[in-house]
Regions:
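Conserved short alpha-helical segments that host acidic/polar catalytic motifs at enzyme active sites
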Residues: 1-237
Length: 237
């Protein structure tokens, strides 16, 4: 697979929607993830990321402007032991509960499908990072409508064993802006992952569309020790 420039990919797409990046730092020592949210409506833009336990959740920046919390207030990141779960919706909780009951990542998502926000039918994108005894692997999933037809849910899971240093995968909800919004197509995209969390955070923050970006979360986890460093950038503050 050809590696793409994450900077160019984001700068040339005004509305990829919500996006997940998972990979490994170039020096091989850190498991890396990033999650961003964007918005076109006042309701979607009226959000911030806040820390909750070892993860984060979305919260209304101005509670008086919150019109419909159903698909925009959720926990995008939760940690279960040596697993970090990152998703674009409340399926974070579904995966957490499934893994806790010894189901696999894929099995946990069997009870879920794309979001019921027709005509967009926003895909549910998810990722899980697994660190154990100095080994690091991850998986990503997308649940989407069949080319906009809600009668059929397409389920794709991508597993990456022994993640390669300096490389990651990027998946997002929408192929591009549109009406209705077209779902992401194809495999998660191969991108570079730098060693420095500040550099990676700045790359993402500066590449996302200025009007539509809302919040960004970046985490670097030390594969040897499990300790982590987190950056949260909210447009509203």
């Amino acid at each position: 697979m050809e590696k793409i420039s994450l900077t160019n990919e984001l700068k040339n797409n005004s509305y990829p929607g919500r996006g997940i990046v998972i990979g490994r730092s170039a020096d091989g020592t850190k498991a890396v993830t990033a999650y961003f949210i964007m918005g076109r409506s006042e309701n979607s833009r009226n959000r911030v990321f806040v820390t909750e336990g070892e993860g984060i959740r979305t919260q209304a920046f101005d509670p008086s402007k919150l019109t419909d919390p159903s698909l925009i207030i959720y926990a995008p990141v939760r940690v279960l032991g040596n697993k970090t779960i990152v998703t674009n919706g409340d399926q974070t909780d579904t995966i957490y509960e499934g893994l806790d009951r010894q189901l696999t990542f894929e099995q946990s998502l069997r009870s879920r499908e794309f979001e019921p926000d027709g005509p967009n039918y926003t895909p549910r994108i998810s990722g899980v990072m697994h660190i154990e005894n100095g080994n690091y692997s991850y998986a990503m999933s997308i649940l989407k409508s069949d080319n906009g037809n809600p009668d059929s849910c397409l389920r794709y899971t991508y597993a990456y064993e022994n993640a390669i240093p300096g490389e990651g995968r990027f998946i997002h909800t929408y192929k591009c802006d549109g009406n209705p919004l077209p779902s992401f197509e194809g495999e998660p995209k191969l991108v570079d992952i730098p060693d420095d969390i500040e550099k990676f955070t700045d790359l993402l923050r500066n590449s996302l569309n200025e009007d539509n970006k809302v919040s960004l979360f970046v985490r670097y986890i030390d594969i040897a020790t499990g300790t982590y460093n987190t950056k949260i950038v909210n447009k509203n503050q």
